[in-house]
Structure formats: C-alpha cells, structure tokens
C-alpha cells in the first residue's frame, strides 16, 4: 500500500527543544543563553533549580557539551544530589559522572589529586570540622600560655576563619599587626601560625583550608589552573549571594579572566538573589552578587520574578517588607495562582501563650484538612526560642523535630568511633588520636599523654610516632603501667589496620569490639548509654550501606580520572566531615512538625509556616537595631521566612517575653508593621492594658485584676547610663559602658564585660546595676 506524502506526520520537537517545555519566557532565555557570563537573579520560588538543571541538560543536548566539561557548585550535599538526579532524568545516566557538588567537596576532589604540590600534605589528609578545630585550638592556646577563658577556642576559631575567608595566611596576619593592634588581634595571629603548623603536621585541613589551599594551588601553579580551565568550560554556581571572598576568588580562578594563556574564559552562570543574602555572620558578602556585572562587564542579567510556590498574599507581604531595603535591585514577585488565604496574625501575652496558639492551630489544621504534621514548619530567630514551643508541643502530643540541634555525626559516641576510623586512615591525625587515647578508659591518663606530647615536640615527630616510641620505652618520665597501656593501644591499631580491606560496616564492627567501646556501653545501666548503643548500631548500618552504594556506583562506570582512589574508608570519612544541617532535614512523610531557625529554613518550603517572635529586639535582633547594614540583613531574613510558605502563613509576637529570667516588654517588630494590614487576619491584637496590668503573671494581659507585685510604687526606676559608667550584670559581671543609644524604654547600651565580651543590652529589661 502506498503512503501519500501528505499523510506523513510532521517531525516532533527535538530532545533539546523538549527541555524548554513548560518554561516561562525568562526561564527559557536563561536556559539557552550562550556567549557571555550569565547572572540569573532568581526570586524566591521562581523555579531556579528547574532552570539550572534544564540549562545543564541543554548544554549537553543542544550544544554538545561533554559531561566532563561541566562543573556545578551548590551549597549543600542535598541540593547537589537533587540537581544530579534531575539532570539524569532529563538526559540519562551519563549525567551521573558530572561534577555536581558543594564548594568544599569540589575542592576536596581537586586537593586529593594535587596534594603533592602542597608541602607536608598527602592525598589521604583528614578534614577537621568545627569541633576538631576547636580542640586543636584549645591545645595550641594552652601551650602558648593564653588565658583560655579570655581567648576561648570558639573565639579564636571564628577569628581565624574570618582571616581564611579573606585569604589572609598566618604570615600576612602577623605582618599586618601594628602598634594599634589590640590584644585579641595579636593573640589570634600567634595562634593562627601555630595552629596551621599543627594542622600540617597532622596531615589535616580544616573547612576553610579546603577553599584557601585550592585557590593557592591554582594561583601558584598556572599549569594546574589551565588544566581545570580546559576541562571545565562551563561553571554554574547556585546561591551565589552566599559566597564569601575565598569562594569568589575560587570561581574566578576556575573560569579564568582572559586568553593570555591561550585558554578563553569558561562560560560562567551564577544564580542568586541579593534579597536572600542572610549569612554575613558566616563570612558571606552580598557584594559578590551586587558587583557581578562590574566584575564581568559583558554579563547578561535575567530576572526571574514569577513565583511558583506561594500565594499572592504571601508574596505581597514579602515584597512590601523587602522594598524597605535601600540600594537593592528592584524586583517584585508575582504568581498566577491567586490571592489565597490571608496571613494569620496573633498577639500573645507571652512566649507560652504564643506557643499554645501555634500548637492549637497545628492541631486544628491536622485534624480538619488535608494538612499533615510534616507539612508544617515553625521558624524562630534564635535557637533558644524553641524551648517554650517544644514544651507545649510535647504536652499537646504533637510530634516534632528540631533541625540544627545535635546532629547524628556530632554525637559523642559517633565522633569517638569516627575518630578511630580517622586514625586508621591517617595515623598522623593528632587531634583524633588524643581524643581516643583513653576512650574508653585504658589507663593512659593526662600525665602520660602530656609526656608523649612533650616528646613529640622535643624530637620533632608526630604524636602517632611518639606513641610508638612510648610503647618501645623511649619516652622519658612514663611509668611502666602507662607504657604497657600505650603498647596495647598501638598493637590494637596494628591489628585493625590489617582489616582495612574488609567491608566498611565490618570494619566499624571490629572497631567497636576491639576497642571495648561497645562492651563498656553494654555493661552500663544508664538508659542514655543504651541510646548511644542504638546510635552506634545505626553507624554500622550507614557504613554497610555506604560500601554497597560505592560498589554499585563503581559497577556503573569508570572512576573519575581526576580523583585518586583513596579507598572506601577515606571516602566515607570525607562524607561524614562535609555533612551539613540542611542535609539532615527530615524528608516528606516523616510525620513530624519541623522546628528551625530562620537561617536554617533558607532554601526550604512548606505548605504551612509559622514565623514567631516578631518583636524589635527579637526579630530584628537586638544587635541590628542601631546598625543599618545588619538591619538590612535582618529584613532579608524576614523576606526569606515569609517566602518559605506555600499556602498558609502565620505571624505572631509576644507582648512580654522572658529575658535573663526577667519579663521584657517587647515593642512590635518594625517588619510586622511593614506588611500591609489588609493582608493580615488578626486572630488577636494587643489589648489596651489597664493601669496596673500584670506583665508576667498568671492573668491575661489587660485583665482588670491588680498586680500587687507590679504596683506603681514598686516599679523599677528607669535606668539611665552614660558612656564610661561602670555596671554589674547578674551573668556577665563587671562592665563599662561604651555606647548608648535610644531613650526611655528603648534605651540600650553596648557594654564591655572584659573576658565575657561586648554585649548590647536594653537598660530597662536586663539585670544590670549602675555602680
């Protein structure tokens, strides 16, 4: 039978064209753009992940870009995994071999391959997390004779991290000291130098080193930088507004700036939103995204303003709040999904009343609609605000999880066993060695440890080598009992190293048995110790699963030629080190309400969101009230919190909130006043108080019942302070006033409490007495 030409079906869209289906005009432009740097200004909920993944897929399908030529950088492992899976769904399994990872994971891969270029480092280096760094800094501080109470490990760690984020090395920090430098700057510079020396001696890098050392390698060895520029012709960076200076320089080095070396710059695409820049306290600088068009003059900028997450009422509230920030790029989120429900507002008597309202609303939603517990999130400005919420949720029988609490890999028992594994992988890891030397107890006390440490310092060997010497009787001042215990410790590790080829789960089991760690917990009658056993069993399961996943991945295709195979143990330890808060947020279906800070909530979305604590001094935070830069960041935080909600948003504040054990009268947050009132359905507003209204007692605020303890005669007189005044605080002790701002009930001072630090307090609500 003949077929006429007119009967033939027209060709359908190509696979590349199909990638553009369902995108709005701005999203399509972002996907297909080529030839110059691209800045995608992606408003909250505007589909940036879809754009990024479609752009990557389009590079492969339409432009013939190889998988190995693409580098995509995210801020969490969870986001990286989601991006990879989405691209695999669009173009197939080949996308699994694309480099999609966090900044830190990307740098680890580069450094594992280039470790030989860094003096004193080899490819199986340990990665010290915040706790490891603080432990090492405590050792360094004590050895240098510093007052650990005045210069705490946390204070030193933050200061050194800030220097590293600015790519300032120890020599530059020392050289930068002047006659005007304060004691803290001098202490930090001296500690920084010794801290780095000990890190290198332990064959270890901390988080900030991962970025800084990679930048140093790329800048010191042009041929290495050229290699990666040739390889990664397309670099995509998500959440660019959250980058710090070191990350900014890293991206610049990977992309290249000119063709002087014969390699044209790579094609750079960054996605971000200055309105969601909320991590200045971690070193992030909003300038990176605000100045992108100046740094890359031929940039194409595309704004994504159509929102696919929230209702228009929620978006209008967010738009109104963020519009008050000066100097921002004009952008207004909109949706075609309709106005939706009004925002629900509630003014509570105190934090307990606020928590009760939240719990009652959650209970009503879960009982009377399609909303389930895992659809609900409760946000607050600071971690300590969760206490009253947790108490009420427990009484109400509402299941919940606090995100950002003690994470699985931060629990003591997990850290102990991971420390054993790290020593097996890197015998020079002094911090891990000293953590487990007498854990569980095996008769190696502080004095014996100190003798070994002195021997290591005097002979110029590592702590691990000094332990071997101690086992051989070469360390002075050690008694026979300690020598025997150390010899047993060294022998135990020799035996365990013979099992490094075992399945990872079996190796963890062997560590638990051979060290006696499990036996000690099993012998305990403390219920908490039994919970620790459960956690260790979970660690064994995680290790087994990791081994299986790694074997399956290896069977699918060849290993990356740019990354040396450091073994399953090193890979596992790397993953443990780089896990983040956002990677442990419960998945949908967990059946629990999620509690978290506003900072942790960034990047997430929930059908129902409660944002609590809308009070000046709480949100915005007290320290931001007199600082325009910090106040702008607090406003961006409000914008982030509001735009997490998909269907329903609740905002609440308390008239009185406890602070330092005292009731504090809290003015309404200025951010709450910036939301158009027609968008809010106030379930309860602030009643006008009677003259003798209780502010902290059992009665409802505004009740006519007199309060004998708060009568006019017994009220605390208004505290008036001036610069230079000496005061005493119930918690911080003696202090001197440095700055004063505000008047009357709103007056506050910045007070230097010496070793307790500088604290900003409200005169009338803090337990402060003028001397």
Swiss-Prot record:
- GO MF: 3'-5' DNA helicase activity; ATP binding; ATP hydrolysis activity; ATP-dependent activity, acting on DNA; dATP binding; DNA binding; magnesium ion binding
Give, as one word, the top-level EC class: isomerase
Q: Explain the induction of this protein.
A: Up-regulated during mouse infection.
How is the quaternary structure described?
Monomer. Interacts with RecA.
What protein name applies here? ATP-dependent DNA helicase UvrD1
Q: Which reaction does it catalyse?
A: Couples ATP hydrolysis with the unwinding of duplex DNA by translocating in the 3'-5' direction; ATP + H2O = ADP + phosphate + H(+)
What are the boundaries of the region Disordered?
A: 1-21, 691-716
Instruction: Report the residues modified as N-acetylserine.
Output: 2
Organism placement in taxonomy: Bacteria, Bacillati, Actinomycetota, Actinomycetes, Mycobacteriales
Q: What Enzyme Commission number(s) appear in the record?
A: 5.6.2.4
Q: How does activity depend on temperature?
A: Optimum temperature is 37 degrees Celsius.
Which GO annotations describe the biological process of this protein?
A: DNA replication; double-strand break repair; negative regulation of strand invasion; recombinational repair; UV protection
Q: How does activity depend on pH?
A: Optimum pH is 7.5.
- Keyword Hydrolase carried by entry: yes
Q: Does the keyword Repressor apply?
A: no
Q: Look up and give the organism this protein is from.
A: Mycobacterium tuberculosis (strain ATCC 25618 / H37Rv)
Per the record, the coiled-coil ranges are none
- Which residue ranges does the record assign to the UvrD-like helicase ATP-binding domain? 21-311
Q: Which Pfam families match?
A: PcrA_UvrD_tudor, UvrD-helicase, UvrD_C
Binding of ATP, residues: 45-50, 309
Cofactor: bound how, per the entry note? Mg(2+); Mn(2+), Cu(2+), Ni(2+) or Co(2+) also support ATPase activity.
- Keywords in alphabetical order: Acetylation, ATP-binding, DNA damage, DNA repair, DNA-binding, Helicase, Hydrolase, Isomerase, Nucleotide-binding
């Amino acid at each position: 039978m003949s077929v006429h030409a007119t009967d033939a079906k027209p060709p359908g869209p190509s696979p590349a064209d199909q990638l553009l289906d369902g995108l709005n005009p701005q999203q399509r432009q972002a996907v297909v753009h080529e030839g110059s740097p691209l800045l995608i200004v992606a408003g909250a909920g505007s589909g940036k992940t879809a754009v990024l993944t479609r752009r990557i897929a389009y590079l492969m399908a339409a432009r013939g870009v190889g998988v190995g030529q693409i580098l995509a950088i995210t801020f969490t492992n969870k986001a990286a995994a989601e991006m990879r899976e989405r691209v695999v769904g669009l173009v197939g399994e080949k996308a699994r071999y694309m480099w999609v990872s966090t900044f830190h994971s990307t740098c680890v891969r580069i450094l594992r391959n280039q470790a030989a270029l860094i003096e004193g480092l080899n490819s199986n280096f340990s990665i010290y997390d915040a706790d490891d760094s603080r432990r090492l800094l405590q050792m360094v501080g004590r050895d240098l004779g510093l007052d650990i109470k005045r210069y705490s490990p946390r204070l030193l760690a933050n200061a050194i991290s800030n220097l590293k984020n600015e790519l300032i090395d120890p020599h530059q920090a020392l050289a930068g000291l002047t006659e005007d430098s304060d004691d803290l700057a001098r202490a930090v510079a001296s500690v920084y130098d010794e801290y780095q020396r000990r890190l290198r001696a332990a064959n270890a890098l901390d988080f900030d080193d991962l970025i800084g050392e990679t930048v140093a390698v790329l800048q010191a060895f042009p041929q290495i930088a050229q290699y990666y520029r040739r390889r990664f012709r397309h670099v995509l960076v998500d959440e660019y507004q959250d980058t710090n200076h070191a990350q900014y320089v890293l991206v610049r080095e990977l992309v290249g700036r000119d063709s002087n070396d014969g390699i044209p710059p790579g094609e750079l695409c960054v996605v971000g939103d200055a309105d969601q820049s909320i991590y200045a306290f971690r070193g992030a600088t909003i300038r990176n995204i605000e100045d992108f068009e100046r740094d890359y003059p031929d940039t194409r900028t595309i704004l994504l303003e159509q929102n696919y997450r929230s209702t228009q009422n929620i978006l209008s509230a967010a738009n109104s709040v963020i519009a008050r920030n000066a100097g921002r790029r004009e952008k207004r989120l909109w949706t075609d999904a309709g106005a939706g429900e009004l925002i629900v507002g509630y003014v509570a008597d105190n934090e307990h009343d606020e928590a009760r309202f939240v719990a009652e609303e959650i209970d009503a939603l879960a009982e009377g609609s399609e909303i389930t517990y895992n659809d609900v999130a409760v946000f607050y400005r600071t971690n300590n605000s969760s206490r009253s919420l947790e108490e009420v949720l427990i009484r109400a029988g509402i299941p919940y999880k606090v995100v950002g609490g003690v994470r699985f890999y931060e629990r003591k028992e997990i850290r102990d066993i991971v420390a054993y594994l790290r020593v097996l992988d890197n015998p020079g890891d002094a911090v891990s060695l000293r953590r487990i030397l007498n854990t569980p107890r095996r008769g190696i006390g502080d004095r014996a440890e100190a003798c070994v440490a002195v021997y290591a310092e005097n002979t110029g060997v590592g702590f691990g080598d000094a332990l071997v010497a101690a086992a051989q009787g070469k360390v002075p001042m050690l008694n026979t009992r300690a020598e025997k215990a150390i010899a047993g410790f060294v022998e135990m590790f020799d035996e365990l190293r013979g099992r490094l080829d075992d399945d990872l789960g079996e190796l963890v089991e062997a560590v638990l048995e051979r060290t006696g760690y499990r036996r000690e917990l099993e012998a305990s009658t403390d219920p908490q110790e039994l919970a620790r056993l459960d956690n260790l069993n979970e660690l064994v399961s995680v290790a087994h699963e990791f081994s299986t996943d790694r074997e399956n991945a290896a069977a699918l295709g060849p290993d990356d030629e740019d990354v040396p195979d450091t073994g399953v143990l090193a890979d596992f330890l790397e993953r443990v080190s780089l896990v983040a808060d956002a990677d442990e947020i419960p998945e949908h279906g967990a059946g629990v309400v999620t509690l978290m800070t506003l900072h942790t909530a960034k990047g997430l979305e929930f059908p129902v969101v409660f944002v609590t604590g809308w009070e000046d001094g709480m949100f915005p935070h007290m320290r931001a009230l007199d600082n325009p830069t910090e106040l702008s960041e607090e406003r961006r935080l409000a914008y982030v919190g509001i735009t997490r909600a998909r269907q329903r948003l609740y905002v609440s504040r308390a008239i009185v909130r406890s602070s330092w054990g005292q009731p504090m009268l809290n003015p309404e947050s200025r951010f709450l006043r910036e939301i158009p009132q027609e968008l809010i359905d106030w379930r309860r507003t602030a009643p006008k108080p009677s003259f003798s209204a209780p502010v902290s007692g059992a009665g409802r605020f505004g009740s006519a019942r007199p309060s004998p303890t708060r009568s006019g005669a017994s009220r605390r007189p208004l505290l008036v302070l001036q610069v230079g005044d000496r005061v005493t605080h119930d918690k911080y002790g003696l202090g001197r006033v440095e700055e004063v701002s505000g008047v009357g009930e709103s007056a506050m001072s910045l007070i230097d409490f010496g070793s307790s630090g500088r604290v900003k307090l409200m005169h009338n609500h803090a337990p402060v007495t003028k001397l």
